[in-house]
């Protein structure tokens, strides 16, 4: 008697240490990949990261202060980033309807299209990889990534506070 095929392939045994090592490999590959993507777009990594946040915000346009907070740079530094992104045709600045002293940052549609064209083949491969996982496994992955991001951000903030206290 043969058993029915499994709907999803069995997973190799892993330990937290092995998972952390795999995560470190992914982070390193992602960092190198991000540098290469930025070069192809004639941007530096920080500018590309800011542009990604602008894209992610969609119609809920961000302020310069929002970007500075997300990328953990000063508002002065983010002004330079926005100047470069605007000169390169990636963003435009719009007056804030609630506060005339502030501006909101909008992505230029043709620049979004260029970025998507570059990233789309990679994301298609990731989508294909997700097809190997059950909905429950994907839910676990999404939960883990979300919680790990929260931990990473909290630890980075803790390090900043320690540094400020030491000064």
Q: Across the structure, where does each feature detected by a protein language model lie?
A:
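Residues at secondary-structure transition points
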Residues: 14-17, 41, 45, 62, ...
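Terminal interaction helix/tail motif
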Residues: 119-167
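Charged, amphipathic alpha-helical coiled-coil/dimerization segments
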Residues: 86-139
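N-terminal leader segment of winged-helix/HTH proteins
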Residues: 1-41
């Amino acid at each position: 008697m043969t058993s029915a095929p499994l709907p999803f392939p069995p997973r190799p045994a892993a330990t937290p240490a092995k998972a952390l090592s795999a995560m470190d490999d992914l982070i390193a590959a992602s960092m190198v990949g991000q540098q290469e993507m930025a070069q192809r777009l004639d941007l530096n990594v920080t500018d590309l990261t800011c542009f990604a946040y602008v894209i992610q915000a969609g119609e809920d346009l961000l302020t310069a202060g929002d970007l500075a907070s997300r990328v953990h740079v000063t508002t002065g530094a983010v002004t330079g980033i926005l100047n470069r992104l605007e000169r390169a045709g990636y963003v435009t600045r719009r007056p804030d309807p609630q506060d005339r002293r502030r501006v909101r940052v909008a992505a230029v549609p043709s620049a979004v299209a260029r970025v998507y064209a570059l990233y789309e083949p990679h994301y298609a491969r990731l989508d294909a990889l997700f097809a190997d996982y059950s909905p429950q496994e994907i839910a676990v992955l999404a939960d883990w990534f979300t919680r790990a991001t929260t931990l990473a951000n909290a630890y980075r903030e803790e390090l900043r506070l320690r540094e400020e206290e030491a000064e």
